[in-house]
Structure formats: structure tokens, C-alpha cells
A protein has these predicted regions:
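Extended alpha-helical interface modules used as scaffolds for assembling large macromolecular complexes
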Residues: 1-139
Length: 139
């Protein structure tokens, strides 16, 4: 009988901490605003002030997130697994690729030779308010 009650609670109680997976991108971008490189028209419009964690390429409609930094953000700060986040995002129609990326390309000579593991998101498939966190003029 106790097991039945537990199952009933699990199935019928509204979860108070349901996760908005798209908003996690916005939160990560907001936390790392000073770690963002923005490229527009092949030119740097915003340079990171600290470690390069995010690259936004407006012409290519790509938002690149450093995979190690984003995974740490998901697991340690939000208790969400990267696999769970990726699944939910693709279910919502977001196009995301996991691959190695030259995050510093077109920025500083020498640094652009190094690839890092990244999540590359097609910005035309994600909520536009995420980009507003970076710069309201981008949307």
C-alpha cells in the first residue's frame, strides 16, 4: 500500500522544479557574458575579457559553448545531465552538434589553431530571448 501511495505521489504531484532546458543556455550565457567572443561579418565585435567560453558567430547563426564549461554548469549548478539536456533540446527542435571547434578563429593569431570540444547550436532553432542576454541589439 505504501508503494502504491509513492507511485501515486510520483505520478500526480506537480514537480516544483521542472527544468526549462532552453533557459539554461540563457543562464549560462548570462553568467559568462564577459567570456564571450562575438563575430559579425567576419570581424570581432566583442572580445572576451576572461577565458573564452562562448563564441557567437552571427553570420553563420552559430552559438558555440565550451563543452567542459557547459557540462560543469549543467551538472554542478543545475543537477541536469548533459545527455538529458541534449535530448530535451533536440526534442524541442533545436539543432545542436557536438564537435571540436576553433573557438578563437578570426580573433587572435596563434590562439586560432586550437580546437576545443563544443556544443554548436543553430541560433535560428533556439529561443531568440537567449541571444538578448548577450546583447539586445542582436535580435
Amino acid at each position: 500500500n505504501i508503494v502504491g501511495e509513492m507511485i501515486d505521489i510520483r505520478d500526480n504531484v506537480v514537480k516544483s522544479n521542472s527544468v526549462n532546458y532552453q533557459s539554461l543556455i540563457g543562464e549560462f550565457v548570462h553568467l559568462n557574458n564577459s567570456n564571450t567572443l562575438i563575430i559579425n561579418g567576419g570581424r570581432v565585435t566583442t572580445e572576451p575579457k576572461h577565458n573564452l567560453v562562448i563564441r557567437l558567430d552571427l553570420d553563420k547563426k552559430e552559438l558555440c559553448l565550451s563543452r567542459p564549461a557547459f557540462r560543469k554548469f549543467l551538472t554542478e549548478e543545475n543537477n541536469v545531465t548533459p545527455k538529458q539536456w541534449l535530448f530535451q533540446m533536440t526534442q524541442s527542435g533545436a539543432k545542436i552538434v557536438e564537435k571540436r571547434k576553433k573557438m578563437a578563429a578570426n580573433w587572435k593569431p596563434g590562439l586560432d589553431q586550437f580546437n576545443v570540444d563544443a556544443y554548436i547550436l543553430d541560433t535560428s532553432t533556439i529561443n531568440k530571448t537567449i541571444l538578448e542576454v548577450i546583447d539586445s541589439e542582436l535580435t
